[in-house]
């Protein structure tokens, strides 16, 4: 008698933050899968758009976990991952609509080879004919991400499975045994690069990360943050620097990375530069914890001198970013223009021009020079005092801007701590209600 091996158990974690507009299509697509998930959990990060109420009313088969606050992508998913016991877990964004065979294809991918720890999808832009993601890669020395196939018309040119550096967390399948070995998502990433990080850790542990083209979906990619916005740039580059400091070799960070970053920084517009400055400040403030995370997740420890070099390099980048906010030659030009100088008399009349100019000069010496020179001296003194005062105001403004930037970083850090505390309180209340019930 032929024995049929059942497919591995598979669950879906759907992390949501104010994604109500996308949930209906996303959940209907999950309900229509050829291989349904054994469990679908909506993890809500404190939405205020009625997401939880909508799902509870219209999709009662979805298990709901309300975190009570926006604790980020990694921490939010980890809440569900700690409870999950399925052999395969699919992390999914609300703005992704899976094709009917997507979960079956992801299950097939991990069944193909026990060394495959993570599998990702072929994701298309709305319309279904343009590729958004067919596996990812990072450029060196700055850890800028790229996507295979992005912007290409899907003509099955990326139709073969392949090992890649990373797949994006909008729709990725993770083997449970991998998480048991390397740990959960790094909660130091609030948003962005947490998927790249866990793929790097998986490959370091000897697992494969694969792009699996049979697993397909539409990624609307607009539910979380507007690309190019100040908040996006700040979060993206904070996470980018956390990633490269966790995983890049010390000699690359201290040399090519800092050098390339400085040149890249000079090309940014003022708004982008301000956002990146905050990312640098947050990174520098978090360096002690990042070095701990680097060793915890299997990276080579950085010796103290290398850590000091990175710290010094970050200070240099911050200073470079801030200096570009002011035109250093502006006050110099103003000071030069503010000096009044006596102009000689000139006449362009042929033959007698020099005589006329000499007469005017002589008359000026007798009639008005004594008075005009006095006024010029007064005006020059006033102009010098004005420029000096402006220099003082500029220095004070620079100082206030630096304090404001540091306060913004501290405020963001404090807000995240408060959100995590709210999530802990919500979880304690849930446990108390469960025991009392």
Where are these regions (language model features)?
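Short beta-strand/loop segment that forms part of the nucleotide-sugar
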Residues: 38-46, 65-67
């Amino acid at each position: 008698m032929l024995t049929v091996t059942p497919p591995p158990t598979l669950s879906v974690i759907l992390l949501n933050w104010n994604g109500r507009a996308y949930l209906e299509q996303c959940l209907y697509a999950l309900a229509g899968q050829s291989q349904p998930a054994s469990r679908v959990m909506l993890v809500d990060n404190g939405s205020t758009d009625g997401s939880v109420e909508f799902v509870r009313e219209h999709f009662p088969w979805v298990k709901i976990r309300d975190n009570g606050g926006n604790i980020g992508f990694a921490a939010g998913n980890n809440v569900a991952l700690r409870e999950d016991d399925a052999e395969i877990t699919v992390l999914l964004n609300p703005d992704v609509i899976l094709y009917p065979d997507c979960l079956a294809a992801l299950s097939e991918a991990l069944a193909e080879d026990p060394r495959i720890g993570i599998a990702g999808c072929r994701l298309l832009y709305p319309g279904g004919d343009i590729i958004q993601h067919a596996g990812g890669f990072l450029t060196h020395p700055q850890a800028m991400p790229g996507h295979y196939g992005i912007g290409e018309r899907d003509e099955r040119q990326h139709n073969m499975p392949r090992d890649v550096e990373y797949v994006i967390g909008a729709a990725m399948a993770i083997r449970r045994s991998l998480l048991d070995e390397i740990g959960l998502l790094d909660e130091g990433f609030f948003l962005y690069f947490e998927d790249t990080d866990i793929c790097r850790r998986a490959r370091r542990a000897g697992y494969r990360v694969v792009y699996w083209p049979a697993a397909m979906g539409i990624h609307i990619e607009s539910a979380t943050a507007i690309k190019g916005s100040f908040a996006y740039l700040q979060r993206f580059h904070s996470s980018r620097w956390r990633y490269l400091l966790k995983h890049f070799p010390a000699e690359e960070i201290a040399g090519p990375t800092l050098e390339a970053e400085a040149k890249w920084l000079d090309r940014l517009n003022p708004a982008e530069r301000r956002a990146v400055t905050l990312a640098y400040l947050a990174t520098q403030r978090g360096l002690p914890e990042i070095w701990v995370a680097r060793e915890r997740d299997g990276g080579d420890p950085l010796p103290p001198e290398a850590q000091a070099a990175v710290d010094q390099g970050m200070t240099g980048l911050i200073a470079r970013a801030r200096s570009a906010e002011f035109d250093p030659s502006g006050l110099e030009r103003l000071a030069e223009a503010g000096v009044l100088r006596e102009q000689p008399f000139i006449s362009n009349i042929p033959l007698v021009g020099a005589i006329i100019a000499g007469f005017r000069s002589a008359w000026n010496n007798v009639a008005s020079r004594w008075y005009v020179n006095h006024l010029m001296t007064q005006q020059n003194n006033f102009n010098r005092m004005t420029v000096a005062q402006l220099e003082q105001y500029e220095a004070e403004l620079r100082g206030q801007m630096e304090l404001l930037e540091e306060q913004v970083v501290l405020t963001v850090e404090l807000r995240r701590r408060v959100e995590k505390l709210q999530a802990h309180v919500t979880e304690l209340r849930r446990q108390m209600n469960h025991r009392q019930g």
